[in-house]
Curated annotation (Swiss-Prot):
Species name: Chlamydomonas reinhardtii
Comment text on domains: The coiled-coil domain is involved in microtubule-binding.
Compositional bias of kind Polar residues: 397-406, 511-520
Compositionally biased tracts (Low complexity): 337-348
Annotated effect of mutating K273E: Does not restore flagella formation in VFL3 mutant strain and does not affect localization at the cilium basal body
GO molecular function, one term: microtubule binding
Keywords attached to this entry: Cell projection, Cilium, Coiled coil, Cytoplasm, Cytoskeleton, Flagellum
Comp. bias regions, Gly residues: 486-510
GO BP, sorted A to Z: cilium assembly
Name of the protein in its database record: Variable flagella 3
Coiled-coil zones: 169-289
Chain positions covered by the region annotation Disordered: 288-526, 539-564
Amino acid sequence: MGDICETVEATFHGVAYLLTVSTIEGETLCVEVEQKSDCSRWRGDFTSRYIEDITAKTGNFKKFPVFVKMLLSALKQASDSVFVDLLTYQDLEVLKSRKAGGQAPPPRTQPPNNKRYLIMTYAAEFDRVHYPLPLLFEENPDPQHLKRIISQLRSEVEGLQVEAGNRRGGEVSAELRRLREENAALQRQLKQMERSGSGVGAGAESSEARELARELRTVRKERDLLQARVEAAEAELERERGLHRRELRRRAKEQQELVDELGRCKEQIRELKMRIRQLTEDLEARDRRMNSTDRIRSVYARGSNDGSTSGVAPRRPSSGGRGPSSNYMAPTRGADSRSNSRGRGTSSAERSRPNSAPIGGPRPRFDPTEYVRQRKERESAAVGGRRSNAPTPPRSAGTSRASSVVGSRPASAERLPPIRTASPTNSRPSSTERYRPGSGGPPGRTSAGGSRGAADRAGARGPDPYAPRSRGASPSGRATAWGEPGASGGGAGGWSKFPGGGGGGVGGSGQRISSNSPRSMSPARALAEVKQKLSTFVAGRGGSLQGDDASSAHGEHMSQSSKSQVFEDATAEIADIDSRLHALQNFLRMAKTSSTSTSTTQA
């Protein structure tokens, strides 16, 4: 076996190396590894006996020539069954620990000489054998080896220079070579003409020579011009390349900014969607609460309307002095029955929900102009009637206070009477509104007394039951202002703001509706209450006036005046409630429309 020297460039674990394998006298294997980045070198010399011993220890014996051929084949990657790897001492310890059972190797100090291990692996059909070759680090390389490297590098430089010259010569221009060939052809042609044209005169030869020289100069000028154009084109191309690179960098920067802005926009869209979802959930919860509140109010209203009935009580004579409770005359039993039956019929017809359409047809809308005209007519008629009547006796304190504000438009909280809810069978009114059968009226009232004419006059000019109450008035004043009769004076069959509640009569159960109940808070229920009480009041007043023969003419005139005032206040109240209902409906419609448009826009 002759001496071998092979140099191969290989990469191990991302680092480039130069591997040199050589044999000395066929008995010694020399392996040199050089790192290309910092020229670090590792070297190892192995005798044939050493190689055969390590192959025998692995269990797969190989002779020295066979081992060298296997190593060269692995370096050149000529065979798939043999390959090499370059490992450090730490890498070798990690491999040993993996084979031992996956435990981490104990910490050790770094081994001296900074060794490297060239591992040649032979993969058989059912076996894999590793042959390690330790390489020592060379701190002081051999001078002979350095000289050999220098000479090798010089030869490589010369080869590269020759190759660059050939490339540069090829880039000079094919046009220059063509011109040179053409010049040589012209020179040969000139020589031929000189030899063949012996008979031609010297003048002709000189003229042809001058012409050829002129053509030669023209060709050279064209050559120089073409070279200048080529150089200018190359400079322009380089400039365009620079502009293109700058444009690419600018476009890449803009693209990155747009990507960042797109991410921010997506984040904002996600936050807005979450906000829309939250607002939608809040709106749905609010709608559910409103629907549940409406259902509760309707249930309370139906229960209250079903449980409220008109009371029937016999008429009792008054047993005391005249007081605030004698504002109304007590009608007869028949008149009271007729008024209660009419009140029940009216309330049952208007007990349905305000939102539902009437049976007879659509309800006419409120006309403010017509309302003002009718009110003026009623006021003028009432003023004329009062002037023609005889003077009336003085009024009580509660009656004067209640009637002083008739004709003015009270606030919405003061136009409706207080509504209280209680059980139809077991009602417990407050101390100022409690009735005791067989005795006087509520606390603070005086017993109704006096002659029938005084009662007639008090009932004829009694206060409007729907006039606003004064906060500072006494309980008796409030009861008189709202038209509550006394227990002994007119509480038996007189008109009351409660359909089923006479003061101390037979059917006076004293039902009242609490002002804090859901029924009183609903505008539609308040409207129904107003209509029912108006009908009951008109029926009761009409029956009482027909039953009294002594004060028929005077009571009729005052009843018309009181009716006009009641209808005026009730109409104003209805208009106010109607405007509030329309405002509430518009608000709900706008809220739903804005929510729907926002959801559609975001989607």
